[in-house]
Design a protein with these regions (language model features):
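N-terminal helix-turn-helix DNA-binding core of bacterial DNA-binding proteins
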Residues: 2-43
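Basic amphipathic alpha-helical segments that dock to polyanions
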Residues: 44-51
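Exposed loop/turn and edge beta-strand positions of beta-sandwich/beta-sheet ligand-binding modules
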Residues: 72
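Amphipathic alpha-helical dimerization/coiled-coil segments
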Residues: 81-105
């Protein structure tokens, strides 16, 4: 599995947390609530495209909103490969942090 950058890891964690409710707005809101970050939608969407090209996420269109001219939301889910990459990345961080003074609460 290839290397995951920090923002890619945060996006994948947001997807894991949101499950079937993950789309641009909910992903960004989760990043703000849980990680204290408010990235631009451009940063979120470009990262999602890159993760999809790597086979770590899959996107699909939901039903259009029930209002005139309502758009369909583009939902995103983790693939098994994405879940595995996230697990490996997290394990590497835990191993690196093990025994480093001042990192545990």
């Amino acid at each position: 599995m290839g290397y995951l950058g920090e923002f890619e890891q945060l996006i994948l964690l947001a997807l894991a947390r949101l499950g079937d409710e993950a789309y641009g707005v909910t992903i960004r809101d989760t990043l703000e609530e849980r990680a204290g970050r408010r990235p631009s939608f451009g940063a979120v969407y470009s990262t999602l495209r890159r993760l999809e090209q790597k086979g770590l996420v899959r996107s699909f269109l939901g039903e259009p909103e029930a209002v005139r001219g309502g758009k369909a939301k583009k939902f995103v889910v983790l693939t098994p490969r994405g879940r595995s990459a996230l697990r490996e990345s997290h394990a590497a961080i835990v191993r690196m942090a093990e025994g480093v003074a001042g990192l545990r609460r």
